[in-house]
Amino acid sequence: MSKRDYYEVLGVGRDASEREIKKAYKRLAMKFHPDRNPGDKAAEASFKEVKEAYEILTDANKKAAYDQFGHAGVDPNRGGGGGYGGAGDFGDIFGDVFGDIFGGGRRGGQRQAARGSDLRYNLELSLEEAVKGLTKELRIPTLASCDVCDGSGAKKGSSATTCGTCHGQGQVQMRQGFFTVQQPCPTCHGRGKIIKDPCSKCHGDGRVEKTKTLSVKIPAGVDTGDRIRLAGEGEAGEFGAPPGDLYVQVTVREHAIFVRDGNNLYCEVPISFSKAALGGEIEVPTLDGKVSLKIPAETQTGRMFRLRGKGVKSVRSHAVGDLLCKVVMETPVNLNERQKELLREFEATLTGESKKHSPKAEGFFDGVKKFFQDLNS
């Protein structure tokens, strides 16, 4: 079956602790265990999937490789001629979680060739790239169908035969004390088939390691957390089974000027004391260049101005966000004597008129005065 994202399988976030991962694993393994769901193939498949996700995410090295490269980073078949492994083995679940609560049971039916694993590629973009869209060339390490044997794993003119040990199931029963568990077949290594004359290139695996280059169109407006699915661009399936998909996971880097919130952009623009008091026009940066913004007289620091349509075009609709500019008044520095003198003269003109010129300051000091009066009464 298709390999889903391991974090999604366990229902945990990417920042989940090992304890949270183990807790989720126990709950799901108990829910899907084959002995609780006899004859339920879907539950058995889910059980195997949960176990595989747990094994990867609780191994520090495997988890790091998976976080970077997705399933390609932890595929046990990447060594060349290796056998089937991973999710198909659930015999050792007893020691991990349930002790000797459950017993095993033989499941009928021949093992089907597995669909190729899905791959994930972590793509980091600048804000400009994410907003405008672009085409990216991606180099993807993957498993491709062997071009010598056409994915069969067998030498030209020969073919695979059903394993006589497991009769095509890929697993055998093992008696351990009072319990019976299943393990990968030691003869066919869990494949269910025997290749007597393996292909010289893929050594019987049917797939070979390959790094392919894809040209991927990134739509305008993508944001961190968005995922682009490329159907059929994952790993090749086993022995001619369908390939998996490739998921491009988008992360947008922080910007030096703008902060993005959905389709809106935010920025802070410094203005001088005189410009805030007297009003005028200032230049404001946008992703398309500078625009002029009219500042009314007596503008207070922290006031927000909205420039409609200067934000981000939605990737899912025709809506366009806004640019919100917060003006921040700068206190002048490195003043010469003449400038200081002018400010002193200006300050002197405000004496006795604070309510008129600084209503917020006057209200604040009135509040402080009342606070201490109440405190001492």
Swiss-Prot record:
Q: Which domain of life is it from?
A: Bacteria
Report CR-type zinc finger ranges.
133-211
Q: Which GO terms describe its biological process?
A: chaperone cofactor-dependent protein refolding; DNA replication; protein refolding; response to heat
Q: How is the cofactor bound?
A: Binds 2 Zn(2+) ions per monomer.
Q: Where are the CXXCXGXG motif repeats?
A: 146-153, 163-170, 185-192, 199-206
Residues that hold Zn(2+) 1 according to the record: C146, C149, C199, C202
**PROSITE patterns recorded for this chain?**
DNAJ_1, DNAJ_2, ZF_CR
Annotated GO molecular function terms are: ATP binding; heat shock protein binding; unfolded protein binding; zinc ion binding
Q: Which Pfam families match?
A: DnaJ, DnaJ_C, DnaJ_CXXCXGXG
> What assembly does the database describe for this protein?
Homodimer.
Q: Which HAMAP family match?
A: DnaJ
Domain notes, please? The J domain is necessary and sufficient to stimulate DnaK ATPase activity. Zinc center 1 plays an important role in the autonomous, DnaK-independent chaperone activity of DnaJ. Zinc center 2 is essential for interaction with DnaK and for DnaJ activity.
Q: What is this protein called?
A: Chaperone protein DnaJ
- Give the organism the record lists: Shewanella sp. (strain ANA-3)
Q: Gene of origin?
A: dnaJ
